[in-house]
């Protein structure tokens, strides 16, 4: 059992090292995309399923409240938090539309959709991205594996942050770290510390 625990830590560290080599440019571009949208008076909509929903919710909470620094709240909405809306849409046999309907109702040109999907194939996330495209929104996609169907929907202005792993647990861990990096970059770009 101890060897298995050590193997989990080792694999996680190896994934972090690979991601540290592969992802800084994409994370930087994503952060600047989010910052520019906020500076233009727009908002960030975010969505995911399961652990990805938790990561989306963490991002929105860190924008609205704060990440590590006291600052004014920033407009972000986690689309997976309103159970009444989600179940109303799903109850009409539109489970694949639970996020897309919200994107069409709340999203505007200049807003950003932060779409989080471990494999990039979740139908409701794919539909949300398709809806965001029709609303002239920019997409920041956090994926893994081969990027799935989601990767093929992205345009030149969009950013994919694809975790270099084929293990869901490692991808989800790195999505959380990536969300924290994005929050840190947004805070330090919009509200630079005097002592930095």
UniProtKB/Swiss-Prot annotation:
Disulfide bonds: none annotated. This is DnaA initiator-associating protein DiaA. Belongs to the SIS family. DiaA subfamily. NCBIfam families: PRK10886.1. Homotetramer; dimer of dimers. InterPro entries: DiaA (IPR023070), GmhA/DiaA (IPR035461), SIS_dom (IPR001347), SIS_dom_sf (IPR046348), SIS_GmhA/DiaA_subfam (IPR050099). GO terms for biological process: carbohydrate derivative metabolic process; DNA replication. Keywords: DNA replication. Required for the timely initiation of chromosomal replication via direct interactions with the DnaA initiator protein. One of its GO terms (molecular function) is carbohydrate derivative binding. CDD domains: SIS_GmhA. The gene is diaA. It comes from the Bacteria. It holds the Pfam family SIS_2. Residues 34-196 form the SIS domain.
